[in-house]
């Protein structure tokens, strides 16, 4: 038991109450000091460093609005659609809560995509922050699962058929696919059993995992310290410190960055509320018009597409056709040949590469392209987990990389946006070809990163962070 701290009898009531709690639960106060008031962050944070806090804010909005929606929602195939309409029409302020939740889902992905992009350009996945990045990617994967399961709950036409299409993709997995799809659906078609399963996962299981990953992400971040736009370590063994041992290039998170984030939150909430009140459907991108029609298992919509934040990966799924498989085989053979003849390695390893390439090519010839589309869609997310070990650049931040790296990253962003656009559009010959090129570029960006990230002469990295006082 820790020794109680004494306080002056003349202290204010606030100080006395604070001292009373601190004597009885000192761990909470220690955590506040470690993670907020005495957590030193680099003093040169910029615009890109607001999105982590905004992601936490949106997570809270989603949890709170979700609780109120569950009070009135009926997870029954015969009642689900009507219960959503009841929330919108008869529950006091139900329309506002529903629009906050639906807009919050899209806002969550906006801030998470921007947060991940900041990590990409500033090298926040590099040593010693590999675990921070891995936990972040796990959060992204968990968020996708949460959004997909919640997407079915309104039980509209697009929800129903979107879930039908995605769940059927699991049936393409050799040997276990049909049984796995049946397990996920709980029936031979998407129905009441599927709705109940997705509801339980969306409301209980996935949020618990998501919250655990968020805590792990923050703990890992605060243990190794935040990165900064220069990619310079402010808490390393050679970093300058003051007499108290605090980094000279750091400032306490509170009050400096709490005020910084409060301003960002204010701007974000103005945009967020403007969308809720004036364009909650966002032209059919946040809430699809087909979802205002009750689910009809006997009537398939003309065009089935996922919500906008899944569309880049949906484009990659559609890009893998039987014709595309031959291009992928050429890539596999070419990659194996390049590895064997370009790099020095033991003969045994060369043999293993040849065997692996032969197995992959044989699998591509024997297994349907639909399965490889699923692999591409999943692999597009999984490959992000390996980013810390793919980047061989001598510098972290894009600021000090060769200029052509910036153009490459810009092309990557444009390619991702184009894939997202194509995923919303109905299939077409031109769209298919463009999405195939975009898919090859997406994977080539990461797979070839160990090679292209070394090319070029980086600019000198400063010993300390660059900071100009405002």
Predicted regions and their residues:
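Membrane-embedded and interfacial regions of multi-pass energy-transducing membrane proteins
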Residues: 2-107, 111-470
């Amino acid at each position: 038991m820790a020794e109680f701290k004494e306080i002056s009898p003349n202290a204010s009531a606030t100080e006395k109450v604070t001292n009373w709690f601190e004597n009885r639960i000192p761990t909470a106060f220690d955590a506040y000091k470690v993670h907020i008031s005495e957590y030193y962050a680099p003093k040169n944070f910029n615009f890109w460093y607001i999105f982590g806090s905004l992601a936490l804010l949106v997570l809270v909005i989603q949890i709170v609005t979700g609780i109120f929606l569950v009070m009135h929602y009926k997870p029954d195939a015969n009642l689900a659609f009507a219960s959503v309409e009841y929330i919108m029409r008869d529950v006091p302020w139900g329309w506002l809560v529903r629009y906050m939740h639906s807009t919050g889902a899209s806002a969550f992905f906006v801030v998470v995509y921007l947060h991940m992009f900041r990590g990409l350009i500033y090298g926040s996945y590099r040593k010693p922050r590999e675990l921070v990045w891995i936990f972040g990617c796990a959060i992204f994967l968990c968020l996708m699962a949460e959004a997909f399961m919640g997407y079915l709950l309104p039980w509209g036409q697009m929800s129903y058929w979107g879930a039908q299409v995605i769940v059927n993709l699991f049936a393409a997995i050799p040997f276990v696919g049909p049984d796995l799809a049946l397990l996920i659906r709980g029936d031979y078609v998407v129905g009441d059993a599927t709705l109940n399963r997705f509801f339980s996962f969306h409301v209980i299981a996935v949020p618990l995992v998501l919250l655990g990953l968020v805590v792990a992400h923050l703990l890992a971040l605060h243990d190794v310290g935040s990165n900064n736009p220069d990619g310079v370590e402010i808490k390393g063994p050679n970093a300058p410190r003051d007499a108290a041992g605090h980094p000279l290039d750091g400032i306490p998170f509170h009050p400096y960055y709490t005020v910084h984030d409060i301003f960002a939150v204010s701007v974000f909430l103005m945009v967020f509320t403007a969308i809720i009140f004036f364009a909650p459907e966002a032209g059919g991108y946040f809430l699809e018009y087909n979802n205002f029609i009750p689910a009809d298992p006997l009537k398939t919509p003309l065009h089935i597409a996922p919500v906008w934040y899944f569309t880049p990966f949906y484009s990659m799924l559609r890009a893998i056709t039987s014709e595309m498989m031959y291009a992928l085989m050429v890539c596999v053979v070419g990659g194996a040949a390049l590895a064997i003849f370009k790099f020095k390695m033991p003969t045994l390893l060369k043999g293993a590469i040849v065997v692996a390439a032969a197995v992959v090519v044989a699998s591509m010839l024997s297994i349907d392209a639909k399965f490889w589309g699923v692999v591409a869609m999943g692999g597009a997310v999984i490959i992000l987990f390996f980013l810390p070990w793919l980047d061989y650049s001598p510098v972290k931040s894009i600021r000090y990389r060769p200029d052509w790296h910036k153009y490459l990253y810009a092309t990557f962003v444009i390619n991702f946006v184009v894939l997202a656009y194509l995923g919303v559009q109905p299939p077409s010959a031109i769209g298919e070809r463009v999405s195939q090129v975009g898919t090859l570029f997406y994977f080539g960006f990461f797979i070839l990163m160990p090679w292209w990230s070394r090319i070029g002469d980086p600019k000198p990295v400063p010993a300390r962070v660059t900071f100009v006082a405002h």
